[in-house]
Structure formats: structure tokens, C-alpha cells
């Protein structure tokens, strides 16, 4: 942070590489790293799938099989319907979100300084610390909830669910509609803000620890064990947040698909 004040350093690290202005601006760094995370996921799983053997599996094959079986077990336990779409979706969500979260473990100055060599002045590498990304994923979950509700109950059932529940009387239709709509919208919004809030806080703590390195020797020396301790703890955070996002998605789809719900 040479030549920068603490506030300038923090502001610089929290600024996106973007194009456009206002609502229509596009965060190029978020798009790039989210796509990169997806490519890494697809590459690893496709490579393991092509090299899979019925003999003694390698370490990577064992890891992939453990993750696949674990996710499939969660879906089987919580989603009581056809799992041919939901299980791969849950696996994709967990692995993709985990990889995006894991980018936060890279030292905060490394990628921005590397990008600076190419004339890129701003770069935020953690897609899940961008509310635009988490809201985008949550909106997809929102439409999947509607899709599975219509698939299991039909469009008529969807209308009944949002007009005759929880009070099964025509006089309460406006109240029911407001209550059910708020409940429905709260699902993707809470899903997005939970992931964003945790990852943004984690990123900010890494930045604040990095600020310590520019202070006197005593404070800088304290920053090293703090950085290591937070990085170790953050491994739990990034894994837990990926699991929560996946788990809540499966639960929401299960509730939407449950024919006996109403």
C-alpha cells in the first residue's frame, strides 16, 4: 500500500473492475472469476470422469467420489422426487460456490498487483463477495422454485397456494397473497445476502490484516499469525457457506415439489 492511506488502500481493494455506469454497469472481474471457477470445476470433474477406473482409484478420483456420494445422499434424504436434475444441480452449486469462495484465500495484494502489470487498476477476485453475483444465483433458484411448484401442483395449484394459504377462505385472498409472496421473495433474498455478507466480511478482514503489514515492525509481526489463523478458520467458513447455499436450495425445491404440502 505504498503511497496510499489506509482508507485509500481499503477502498481500492473494494473497487470492482467494471464497465458502464449506474444500474447497468458490469463487474468484469466478477464475471471472469466466476467463469474461471466454473471452468475449473468442469475440467476437474470431466478429467476424473474420463480417467475413472474400477480398480484402485487415485486420490483425486476418491475425493470426487466422496463429494458426489455425499451430495447425492443429501439430495436423496431431502428431495422426495426425481433427482436426475436436482442432484447434479446441488453438486454444481456446492463445488462452484466453494471454488469461488476459496479464491478469498489468495493473498489480497497478489492478484491486484499481477493485474496491475497489464494496466488493470481495480480487481476484486472473489465473486461471492459481490452482491450482484449472489443475487444472480439466488434469482435462478427463485425461478426453479416456481418451476417445481408448477411441475408438481400445476399452474392452478400455484395460484391456490398463493391465494388460499394459510387462510383457506376467499375473503383472505389479498392477505394470503401478500404473506405468501413475502415468504417466497424472502428465500432468494436471504440466500443471496447470507453468502454475500459472510464472504464480504471475510474479504474485509483479510484486507484489514494486510494493512497491519504497513505499520511498525511489532504490528506487522502480529499480522502474520493473525493472517494464518484467519485463513485456517476461513477454510471452514468458505466450506460452510457453500454447503448452506446448496442445502437451502435443495430444501426450497423440496418444499416446492411436495405435492402433499397443501
Swiss-Prot record:
Where does the UniProt annotation locate this protein? Cell inner membrane
Segments crossing the lipid bilayer: 26-46, 86-106, 130-150, 204-226, 240-260
Q: Which GO terms describe its cellular component?
A: plasma membrane; proton-transporting ATP synthase complex
Gene3D superfamilies the record matches: ATP synthase, F0 complex, subunit A
NCBIfam families annotated for this entry? ATP_synt_6_or_A, PRK05815.1-1
Q: What family does the database annotate?
A: Belongs to the ATPase A chain family.
What protein name is recorded for this chain?
A: ATP synthase subunit a
Q: Which organism is it from?
A: Haemophilus influenzae (strain PittEE)
What gene codes for this chain? atpB
